[in-house]
């Protein structure tokens, strides 16, 4: 990967169109397809469409070792309300399916971002009974974090393996491993993708602890501040971000990218806040080699303007550095 500061854009309903894809030429470094939100049967179509409308490279971002909700219809809950999560064929389930067997009574679940928290109060072979510990909304495909303990999951899902197989046929050269937790995760990913560019995502307390070891095995890392905040608490994100970048500087040729909430305001508004501008500048000043736009370009109303503002901030940072 090049030494220039990179911009990674997540594609979604707002940006998977000819106009935005054409706009990204010479402005964006990578276009991210998030397999947590891309249907397997649509992947070939998306890759073909992207390649026809832009020369910007594609990055396949795996689902990785994360638990997600599977429900037919979103539902609102009050505090202390009881609900069930079924193992199979229920209105509310979890993905990947094998996680059901790993959950225990008293496990505390944090679902989505500021959406809902609940505790498992009973379990049988068919379903879990949970009691909400906050009010909130339960929606489909939301990340689920187990607050009280670490659950070992496969580093890639079946869907991930299928996506990698498809991507290889299209000669995609860039891949990201979500929830890189251990040295073994990196070794396994390197083995199945030996020649491709790989980005390893730091999204858990375990990953932060192991980051020093990670830098000996790979070159490109991404701090996902959203999922990481579920594991180490949001107030510790600035500390973790600085720690990881500081460690990266002790190793030659290491790149740290940062994601989540850089321009959250621009999902609905044409201009960012002063705090967002400051966050971007501070991240660059710390030594971030790349910045990631997620919801801003995937579902935001102004994906092109978000990219333009990020480019402005990078230019200002570079110019100020020369003063």
Task: Identify the function of each model-found stretch.
Residues 1-323:
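Non-catalytic helical/linker scaffolds that mediate oligomerization, partner binding
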């Amino acid at each position: 990967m090049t030494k220039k500061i990179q911009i990674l854009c997540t594609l979604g309903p707002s940006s998977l169109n000819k106009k935005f894809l054409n706009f990204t030429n010479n402005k964006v470094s990578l276009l991210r397809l998030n397999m947590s939100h891309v249907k397997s049967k649509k992947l070939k179509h998306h890759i073909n469409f992207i390649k026809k409308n832009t020369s910007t490279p594609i990055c396949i971002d795996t689902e990785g070792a994360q638990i997600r909700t599977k429900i037919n219809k979103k539902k609102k809950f009050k505090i202390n309300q009881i609900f069930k999560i079924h193992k199979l064929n229920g209105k509310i389930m979890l993905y990947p399916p094998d996680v059901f067997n790993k959950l225990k009574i008293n496990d505390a679940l944090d679902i989505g971002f500021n959406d809902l928290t609940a505790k498992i109060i009973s379990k049988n072979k068919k379903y879990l009974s949970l009691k909400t510990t906050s009010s909130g909304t339960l929606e489909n495909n939301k990340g689920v974090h187990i607050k009280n303990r670490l659950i070992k999951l496969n580093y890639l899902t079946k869907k991930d393996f299928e996506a990698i197989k498809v991507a290889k046929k299209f000669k995609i050269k860039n891949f990201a491993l979500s929830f890189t937790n251990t040295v073994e995760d990196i070794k396994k990913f390197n083995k199945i993708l030996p020649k491709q560019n790989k980005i390893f995502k730091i999204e858990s307390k375990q990953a932060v602890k192991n980051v020093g070891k990670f830098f000996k095995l790979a070159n490109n890392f991404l701090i996902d501040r959203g999922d990481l905040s579920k594991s180490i608490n949001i107030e510790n994100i600035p500390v973790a971000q600085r720690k990881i970048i500081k460690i990266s500087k002790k190793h030659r040729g290491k790149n740290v990218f940062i994601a989540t909430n850089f321009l959250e305001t621009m999902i609905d508004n044409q201009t960012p806040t002063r705090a967002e501008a400051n966050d971007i500048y501070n991240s660059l000043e710390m030594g971030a080699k790349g910045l990631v736009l997620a919801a801003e370009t995937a579902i935001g109303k102004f994906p092109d303007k978000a990219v333009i503002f990020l480019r402005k901030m990078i230019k200002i940072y570079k110019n100020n550095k020369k003063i």
